[in-house]
Amino acid sequence: MAAPTAKVSRGWSGLALGVRIAVLRLPGLTQVRWSRYGPEYQDPQIDKEYYRKPLAQLTEEETYERELRKTQVIKAAPATKTSSVFEDPVISKFTNMMMKGGNKILARSLMTQTLEAVKRKQFEKYHAASAEEQATVERNPYTIFHQALKNCEPVIGLVPILKGGHFYQVPVPLAERRRRFLAMKWMITECREKKPRRMLMPEKLSQELLEAFCNRGPVIKRKHDMHKMAEANRALAHYRWW
């Protein structure tokens, strides 16, 4: 009885192998792990200005692309994307980094309260200033947020490189995406770890943003410390290539 059982098992394995080979050869399937869409799917275009542009003002390439998209399959737009005029990708990224436990509603609420606190503080400063000084007071919280992050971005970072059994901290220039990530990470870490027990997150974050906007505060100091370490290790810069 053992021989027929082995023959049946071998038959099933051969059938499964044949089905697998047939599936792999199908052109409509994609061998990308965790991918919902195949390579033939195009990214969605959610910008309203893209559709508001008259056809007479389109170039030949834009006209060809628009006609081509009529016959192509388009991916579903992410739930986090919107065509609102208030959409800011940098603030959305900061909100996602500030989120804990997947509670994005709370993270959005904290971000909204932070921007409101920044605006209230700046308006108090504006009304308390003289007529000459009022022109120099920035009251737009979005402008303050972007400038504060820009001031916190390091230009040069340190990367550990193994040479001769030892790790050396080698200074390397940072990409724009990495600089923005470090600025956001330092800002959030400073507000979480150095925040007084009875101080709310929006109050602490608004203080740090205003200090960074004026090139002051612990986050700016951390950026300068990284630059000093990179300057001290500049003799190891050639380890990037050797």
Swiss-Prot record:
Any one Gene Ontology cellular component term annotated for this protein: ribosome
Subcellular location: Mitochondrion
BP terms from Gene Ontology: mitochondrial translation; ribosomal small subunit assembly; translation
InterPro entries in UniProt: Ribosomal_uS7 (IPR000235), Ribosomal_uS7_dom (IPR023798), Ribosomal_uS7_dom_sf (IPR036823)
Residues where N6-acetyllysine is found: K228
UniProt KW keywords: Acetylation, Mitochondrion, Ribonucleoprotein, Ribosomal protein, Transit peptide
GO molecular function, one term: rRNA binding
Domain of life: Eukaryota
Transit peptide: 1-37
Family from the record: Belongs to the universal ribosomal protein uS7 family.
Quaternary organization: Component of the mitochondrial ribosome small subunit (28S) which comprises a 12S rRNA and about 30 distinct proteins.
Protein name per the record: Small ribosomal subunit protein uS7m
Organism name: Bos taurus
